[in-house]
Amino acid sequence: MTTPKEVIEFAKENDAVMVDMKFIDFLGTWQHFTVPVGEMTEEMLEEGRMFDGSSIRCWQTIDNSDMKVVPDLSTVKMDPFYEHPTLSVICDIQDPVTGEDYSRDPRNVTKKAEKYLVSTGIGDTIYVGPEAEFFLFDDVRFAQGPEGGFYSIDSTECPWNSGAEEMGGNKAYKIGHKFGYFPSAPFDQDRDIRAEMVLTMQDMGITVEAQHHEVAPAQHEIDFRFDTMLRSADMMQWYKYIVRNVAIDNGKTATFMPKPMFSDNGSGMHTHQSIWKDGQPLFAGDQYGGLSEMALYYIGGILKHAPALAAFTNPLTNSYKRLVPGYEAPINLAYSNRNRSAAVRIPVVDSPKGRRIEYRCPDSGANVYLAFPAMMMAGLDGIQNKIDPGDPMDVNIYDLPPEKLNKIAKMPSSLHEAMEALKSDHEFLLKGDVFTKDVIDYWLNWKMEEEVKAIDSRPHPHEFELYYHC
């Protein structure tokens, strides 16, 4: 759908009584408000509606608060999680005075990135395919205050419940630590919930390729087909929305938090990327791994800027509890053919059209409307400056002796380190005005003040075990 008349007709055909207007905030959370379908006029669909931008995190001040949401008519769908038939549309944010797209609207950053790619002449399309893992729990509790803090997670799949008394009796079949990859029923207890998620995605026009249990107990993955950067980012938001709501409908709770469970694998968002021009794949060639020279330079840019990229691809303090040795997390900045211990993997493919690179460091805590463009900008910088990625690492990097391992560059070990890296390395993001200095500065300030310092200033329960009797 591309015209207001088509959208209004679609609403009538589906008996919609409400219109839900969704938009992404600066940190990556969907916000929304809903209007009766009678308010959905052609004028409203073309011009948008006003709202208070000062009430959204990281946006306007109260003395300059008026903002406008403008529907992107190509994103119209029926939302399956409302009792009353509700049409949903993703919106862009504009300044109502100038009519210009708002610089801190993350979706605007993605749109500018796609335009910048075309302007370089390098390619006309970038395809992105994220693989986002998540956990499903039966019970989650947490609290934090001056008097104490705790968290508690639970799933009937988890091994600590092997001795628990359960309603109707404990039937065993728990999943041990790091033994959850591809188990069949009855170990895979939430298989039907995943299937419901997939069917819901398909009903909404999302092409799903596969779904399965992941390595950790209660951990899962559903893979949808790659698409252009903006459409893939939009699908990622629907993906999270569907997973969370189907989980709630089935008495579960879903999280995309990178590391909710100590001593087991965390959740990543491995991101496949390829550039095309005039319908031809530019990453296919006769170099290492079947890649083109351009693709190798793209990898060089990713690896060079990876510490700064981490500020967007791994933007949570919790992200760095996943990026530690021993849990299949790619902390070593190297590339390789088929090798999952490297930060960049070159998957085996059947044809040149499938030739791509997979960046394995990101996690789903990322705001994909910022993370996808940041990765592309790093890769393009590699192409523009012919950055050599070095020699591939065709060994299990985790097994290298310390003297060799220490020569390989590493991902940051904390969000603070990632922010410092971004502070000193962000010029590549400013090309084409894709990221503005304001966006980078605001991101740095928010993450440091509201997250890094907030975590650093609070006692941790494990500190009591270590230090109470000091």
Segments and roles (model prediction):
Residues 1-470:
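Glycine-rich, acidic/polar active-site loops that bind/position phosphate-bearing ligands
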